[in-house]
């Protein structure tokens, strides 16, 4: 084992970029090559079936089962032309990954042979075993039946030889067991609520679409080095490891030249992603060494979520091909930035109006203010719930550190919009207003044209920032399913818009002019949601004190934050918006607490194993070597001179002894804390026990191990060090 680290380091240095064959046509020509999109539908489906299916996708009408067989036949024909032999219902259970079971296109022909078959029934509905997925007690082990049902709004795609059909996943009794079902409900409710409010300004609007543009951050680690780090393999993060002397302090990695091997990986990934219809746009180095980002063009929210889940799976496949492992954990390395997934969220009407963008007329700008303020109302009322939606055992490592948004939800608007809302709040009732357009900025450099400066700056410490025509939810974790946070955001804003319309209509019913009524309610809401607006430094201690005074949720314990899902206001909001029932919320919380416990439990077990089987043996081996050196020196030089010459080694021997003893006691205490926690029956209380008693002991052990790493001879240390993991590319 002593030489394994050096073997894998040498192996990593030998690796060269994998050659990637670039398609000989433009990206636009192979985009969505393996997606059953509208062009394929038009080609492979009868015209009447095509029209009905498009109506389902565009207008949300119920799928007519009578066309299912024709759709399935067209899909099968297209799939077989692409070498497909199997199909699967592809869904997103509460594991935060995806799930699939592959079935072949074969049935008995009744004559002792087989025929290829794929019916509408198989396309529309399947029955996976629901008892083996996280369900929070909704299903007992002996109650295995669950249903997966086709989501026609997200196109079918091909991976290898399998036709993948995006589906929802529900229990036998109808409760959602996935992320997609409540996401679709939230999108439907938000569209209805936003459309009703739009009718004050644009009577012809029929629906409002929610758009999402995510920014996926990730780390790449050489596969050889990864294989020599059991903690990375089993938990997704390093449980020990001293900082590299150089990490990100020079700011030289962000937007730097992309390393050759990484560039080959990115190129391969983008080609395959484009073929699957994922509109990749941007790639670059991130702040930390070996950290990178990929971002697509924004899409309709449901499709964007599916594409993000598909991309994370694809990244792992492509990374392996290039001799890398992709790390999606929010904090794989201590001492350098973790990874997030900014969610750029916006609303757009079917007539092309961006509802969070300012317009050119007073009417447009009043609409703009209404949607800004009602979004803030939803975020303010449910700020604790929004925090719960992005909280996890992994993301908790990142939030609140001086690298990511704090664990207090607030919204940054920028000076101009803040001044505007303050002006409306204090202005005379009938005063009209208009927002200025972008202002030019002369750079005094002849070769550079005038820049058009946005009316909003950026505040990287803000979890929910307005960025010109959208809001950027920055607290979402890198390995999370975006749907978790968007379900809450969509439902909260839908509720706010519904409440807004109810109050405006009440004033109109009393005889007040529509514009006057809208301004009255907007001014009232500007005052109400003012505590959520914060343009300062979210990292400061002063903000934590101020947030408490404002009544914002400042709880930092992950298991306790999950309680927000079961607050009366949350249950009522989800019920009113028809997004989730109380039983679904309770079940999901059970899953969240159980998942939190299991992740910390696994980390604790891995740490105990590595400590006793790697760290302690290596440290004591080095200690013994030093002891022999001391003994030999004293024999050669005699008493006083020998003691003087060996004083440094004796000091190291003593420090190793003290630290290993502390570590061994720490591991024993860690095991005992786990035993106590494991006896707790309540999933909530067990998760809290793991948070309060188990996780802190791991940090104490890590501190001692990282100190030992600096003491023990480099040639003996068996685990690849941070400098190797972060700088070998």
What residue ranges belong to the model's regions?
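Flexible inter-domain linker/hinge segments
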Residues: 7-9, 21-42, 188, 192, ...
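Active-site core of metal-dependent hydrolases
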Residues: 30-143
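Glycine-rich, acidic/polar active-site loops that bind/position phosphate-bearing ligands
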Residues: 143-328, 337-340, 347-590
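Active-site proximal loops enriched in glycine and acidic residues that flank catalytic Cys/His/Asp
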Residues: 67, 91, 119, 296-298, ...
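Active-site-proximal loop/turn and secondary-structure-junction residues that shape catalytic pockets
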Residues: 67-71, 91-93, 121-122, 169, ...
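C-terminal amphipathic alpha-helical interaction region
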Residues: 524-729
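Short linear, low-complexity motifs centered on an aromatic residue
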Residues: 96-113, 131, 229, 236-238, ...
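N-terminal hydrophobic targeting/anchoring segments and the immediately downstream early-domain regions
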Residues: 2-24, 141-155, 162
């Amino acid at each position: 084992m002593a030489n394994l680290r050096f073997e894998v380091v040498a192996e990593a240095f030998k690796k060269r970029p994998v050659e990637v064959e670039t398609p000989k046509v433009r990206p636009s020509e192979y985009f969505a090559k393996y997606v059953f999109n509208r062009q394929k539908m038009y080609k492979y489906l009868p015209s009447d079936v095509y029209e009905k299916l498009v109506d389902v996708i565009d207008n949300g009408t119920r799928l007519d089962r009578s066309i299912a067989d024709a759709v399935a036949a067209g899909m099968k024909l297209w799939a077989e032309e692409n070498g497909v032999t199997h199909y699967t219902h592809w869904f997103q259970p509460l594991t935060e990954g995806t799930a699939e079971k592959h079935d072949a296109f074969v049935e008995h022909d009744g004559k002792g042979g087989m025929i290829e078959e794929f019916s509408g029934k198989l396309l529309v509905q399947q029955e996976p075993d629901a008892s083996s997925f996280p369900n929070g007690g909704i299903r007992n082990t002996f109650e295995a039946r669950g249903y997966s049902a086709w989501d026609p709004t997200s196109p079918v795609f091909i991976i290898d030889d399998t036709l993948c059909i995006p589906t929802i996943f529900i229990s036998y009794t109808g409760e959602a067991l996935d992320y997609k079902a409540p996401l679709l409900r939230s999108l439907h409710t938000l569209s209805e609520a936003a459309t009703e409010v739009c009718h004050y300004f644009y009577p012809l609007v029929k629906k409002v679409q929610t758009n999402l543009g995510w920014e996926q951050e990730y780390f790449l680690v050489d596969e050889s080095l990864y294989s020599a780090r059991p903690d990375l393999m089993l938990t997704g993060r390093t449980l020990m490891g001293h900082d590299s002397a150089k990490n990100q302090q020079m700011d030289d990695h962000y937007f730097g030249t992309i390393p050759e091997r990484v560039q080959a990986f990115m190129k391969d990934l983008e080609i395959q992603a484009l073929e699957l219809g994922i509109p990749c746009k941007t790639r670059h180095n991130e702040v930390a060494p070996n950290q990178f980002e990929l971002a697509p063009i924004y899409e309709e929210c449901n499709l964007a979520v599916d594409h993000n889940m598909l991309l994370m799976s694809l990244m792992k496949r492509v990374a392996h091909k290039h001799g890398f492992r992709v790390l999606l954990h929010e904090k794989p390395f201590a001492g350098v930035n973790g990874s997030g997934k900014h969610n750029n969220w916006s609303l757009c009407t079917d007539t092309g109006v961006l509802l969070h963008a300012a317009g050119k007329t007073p009417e447009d700008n009043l609409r703009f203010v209404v949607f800004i303020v009602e979004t803030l109302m939803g975020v303010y009322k449910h700020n604790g719930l929004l925090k719960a939606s992005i909280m996890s055992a992994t993301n908790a490592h990142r939030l609140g550190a001086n690298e990511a948004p704090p664990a207090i939800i607030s919204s940054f608007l920028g000076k101009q919009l803040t001044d505007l809302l303050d002006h409306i709040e204090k202005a005379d009732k009938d005063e009209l207003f208009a927002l200025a357009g972008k202002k030019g900025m002369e750079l005094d450099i002849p070769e550079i044209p005038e820049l058009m400066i946005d009316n909003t700056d950026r505040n990287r410490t803000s979890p929910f920032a307005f960025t010109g025509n959208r809001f950027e939810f920055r607290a979402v974790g890198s390995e999370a399913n975006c749907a978790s946070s968007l379900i809450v955001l969509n439902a909260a804003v839908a509720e706010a818009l519904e409440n807004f319309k109810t109050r405006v209509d009440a004033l109109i019913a009393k005889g007040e002019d529509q514009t006057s009524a809208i301004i009255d309610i907007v001014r009232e809401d500007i005052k109400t949601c003012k505590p959520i607006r914060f343009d300062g430094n979210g990292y400061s201690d002063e903000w934590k004190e101020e947030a408490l005074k404002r009544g914002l949720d400042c709880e930092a314990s992950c298991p306790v934050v999950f309680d927000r899902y079961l607050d009366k206001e949350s249950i009522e909001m989800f019920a009113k918006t028809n997004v989730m029932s109380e039983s679904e919320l309770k079940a999901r919380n059970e899953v969240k607490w159980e998942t939190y416990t299991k992740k910390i439990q696994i980390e604790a077990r891995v740490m105990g194993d590595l400590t006793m089987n790697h760290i302690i043996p290596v440290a004591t081996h080095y200690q013994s070597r030093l002891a022999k050196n001391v003994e030999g020196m004293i024999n050669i030089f005699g008493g006083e001179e020998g003691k003087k010459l060996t004083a440094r080694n004796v000091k190291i021997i003593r420090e190793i002894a003290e630290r290993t003893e502390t570590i061994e006691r720490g591991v024993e205490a860690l095991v005992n804390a786990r035993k106590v926690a494991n006896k707790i029956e309540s999933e909530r209380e067990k998760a809290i026990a793991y948070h309060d008693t188990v996780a802190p002991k791991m940090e104490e052990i890590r501190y001692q191990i990282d100190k030992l790493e600096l003491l023990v001879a480099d040639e003996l240390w068996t685990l690849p060090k941070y400098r190797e993991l972060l700088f070998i590319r």
